[in-house]
Amino acid sequence: MASPRTPVSPPELPEKNFQYRQVQYWDQRYKDAADSGPYEWFGDFASFRALLEPELCPEDRILVLGCGNSALSYELFLGGFPNVTSVDYSPVVVAAMQVRYAHVPSLRWETMDVRALDFPSGSFDVVLEKGTLDAMLAGEPDPWNVSSEGVHTVDQVLSEVGFQKRTRQLFGSHTQLELVLAGLILVLAALLLGCLVALWVHRDPAHSTCVTEACIRVAGKILESLDRGVSPCQDFYQFSCGGWIRRNPLPNGRSRWNTFNSLWDQNQAILKHLLENTTFNSSSEAERKTRSFYLSCLQSERIEKLGAKPLRDLIDKIGGWNITGPWDEDSFMDVLKAVAGTYRATPFFTVYVSADSKSSNSNIIQVDQSGLFLPSRDYYLNRTANEKVLTAYLDYMVELGVLLGGQPTSTREQMQQVLELEIQLANITVPQDQRRDEEKIYHKMSISELQALAPAVDWLEFLSFLLSPLELGDSEPVVVYGTEYLQQVSELINRTEPSILNNYLIWNLVQKTTSSLDQRFETAQEKLLETLYGTKKSCTPRWQTCISNTDDALGFALGSLFVKATFDRQSKEIAEGMINEIRSAFEETLGDLVWMDEKTRLAAKEKADAIYDMIGFPDFILEPKELDDVYDGYEVSEDSFFQNMLNLYNFSAKVMADQLRKPPSRDQWSMTPQTVNAYYLPTKNEIVFPAGILQAPFYAHNHPKALNFGGIGVVMGHELTHAFDDQGREYDKEGNLRPWWQNESLTAFQNHTACMEEQYSQYQVNGERLNGLQTLGENIADNGGLKAAYNAYKAWLRKHGEEQPLPAVGLTNHQLFFVGFAQVWCSVRTPESSHEGLVTDPHSPARFRVLGTLSNSRDFLRHFGCPVGSPMNPGQLCEVW
């Protein structure tokens, strides 16, 4: 449930300043505001988040003094700080807040005078207040010569909660008087701002500036993210995000932080509340399974007590591991079937069931390259540059082997052999930028033909085990992506010693399962992640890890809880309307392309018309019987987290087998409803926008349309344009991989994409160039999505007229569209994480998703007046759509 957000007018000020100290004034004020939303003094939680989070841990007991009807306490809860007590000496507002947030039991509300707090000593770790101490000083006759009584009152409150020492640590050696004066300056600044707003409204009877609470709030967020010291034509990313970057240092334990991470943290807090406070008596069985799974993950004491035993027992059951004890030397196929079949690890290759790209109405077995633990083959092959990572990885392998019972010296020797095998795998793995032409890498063959291609594996035996109880024969069709890779893998298996093969297979199982074991395994992984991504050990609570695990295991059952509690059905209708507006704008662009012939243009328009959109969630999650059917057969217990994970792997294999003889279903989403993301699926020609992304800053019903089109509108345009990027354009309107372009148009398309590939290949991060080919599809989608969304916004303006501008930001609504787009991508990353993104991510880094796209936008250059030759207007524009 979201915090109430009805617009709030500025409150009536008391006749005399000292009335701020009288409970009668506040009681009357809150009675008058009974139907209004929260009123925030000096800003909301987001305004101070960057300052607060370094001082807070999720376990902190927080006291909020003088809470009023602010949403601060609830927003702290949503931000991952659930233990909040709020006090105010107006019983009227306390009663109102108890009712408003009755659905959040961890929030406590007390009627209390801050000058006489009735809490035991040591009850709180952190104390927050916004203006309460200033209000206590409101009766001072001379704000520049505060009376000793006034200073004593402030000091008394701080001492009462044991906060005085911490305050001095935060503010150094400043005197109490200096601290009080600092507070008074904030009050005066707030009053001055109020006067300026009132003066503006008075001088402009037409109220041309939007002064609703939503407009004021979002204007504040935009302003605090901007860096006005940078010209927008010099560096628009820094102009739009410089303030945000200063205010958002990387949280502990994170290698990157951005809007997506922030929203996912917020969604996790909501899911935590739902799992811990929902009465599941009338829920579906699938929803009850989410709670049982989540609780099993939270049982840290039991997990610690079991230690490594669950995995050691599993290894023994499979046939042993040469690193830790006896093993069966003739068991390669049996171990491969167990590791890759029963427990769904991916040594050497990955096997899955999905829609046939050339016959999208049917599912087919598919085989592709896999088998590397590190994020990219580059980490194995560029050994000089990645020596630290390879050393840390080997140390991690050895530490886990020893934790599972191996001897340090022999474990290191054998793990070195496993690492060398992975390096050989990396050598034959095809780089992602060489796999972009799906027509070239798609190879359909029978199992018998696959057997001839890669004879080291008994494919009929393996696939029959994997897809049991289905009966397969030698003629069963299979799609292989990368025949040369599989051929070389087969040769690699044949020339590798059986003991090394066994160690490698079991190592894949160990990688898959150690996250379900005790803290020692987590600590070992943290050391590797620090080297790989630059992360530091964090105080990330166990519940947050468990929410992610529950989402992975039972994401759609969890999504049912999330959607019922948070999703506004009106958002779905509005999103549908926006998609249609953006589709129309894209199709108008198709009509203007001079390089496309008429036959290809008509087929492209038909494909755009045929794109199917899915908004919010699949319908089945709100039908208890259908939802239960999805997870029927998955056994979940509160007693064993490790066994729940093993059951999940086995269950997913059965689900995969069940899909093979069925046609693909539109209800089968690739993302759960709470996910903060979106995607395009070419074999269904569909775009999907989960509920998790349909919220601010991407979308809010009371935000200016300029921001909504610049936020979720660009995301919608991006996903729609994927249907026509260098890979999506190979699929027709039915989702089938086939050539449907005329040769002349295809040649022209490739010339335009070559410009974009070259453009992005010139950008650098920490002296390392982007791969313009690897990121080509996403760059095409970014550029096309921005153009379609902006054209849709212009069409909306023609129909509805100009919007009121936001106060204080000094931007036209057209400029606001581009700032809104850019601020969605404000981001901070460690250097290690930035490198990992360059070698693995098909997206460009956030900075260049903004700079690259806008420097190609004629509309942006016109509205910001960037002259040719300025950094944002280099003179040559790359346009595809």
Curated annotation (Swiss-Prot):
Knockout or disruption consequences: Eef1akmt4-Ece2 and Ece2 double mutant mice are fertile and healthy, and do not display any abnormality in terms of growth or aging.
Residue ranges annotated as Cytoplasmic topological domain: 1-178
Keyword hit for Transport: no
UniProt KW keywords: Cytoplasmic vesicle, Disulfide bond, Glycoprotein, Golgi apparatus, Hydrolase, Membrane, Metal-binding, Metalloprotease, Methyltransferase, Multifunctional enzyme, Phosphoprotein, Protease, Signal-anchor, Transferase, Transmembrane, Transmembrane helix, Zinc
PROSITE patterns: NEPRILYSIN, ZINC_PROTEASE
Activity: how regulated: Inhibited by phosphoramidon.
Modified residues (Phosphotyrosine): 39
Cellular component terms per the entry's GO annotation: cytoplasmic vesicle membrane; Golgi membrane; trans-Golgi network; transport vesicle membrane
Reaction catalysis annotation: Hydrolysis of the 21-Trp-|-Val-22 bond in big endothelin to form endothelin 1
Stretches assigned to the Lumenal side: 200-881
Protein's job: Converts big endothelin-1 to endothelin-1. May also have methyltransferase activity. May play a role in amyloid-beta processing.
Family membership: In the N-terminal section; belongs to the methyltransferase superfamily. In the C-terminal section; belongs to the peptidase M13 family.
Name the UniProt record assigns to this protein: EEF1AKMT4-ECE2 readthrough transcript protein
Natural source organism: Mus musculus
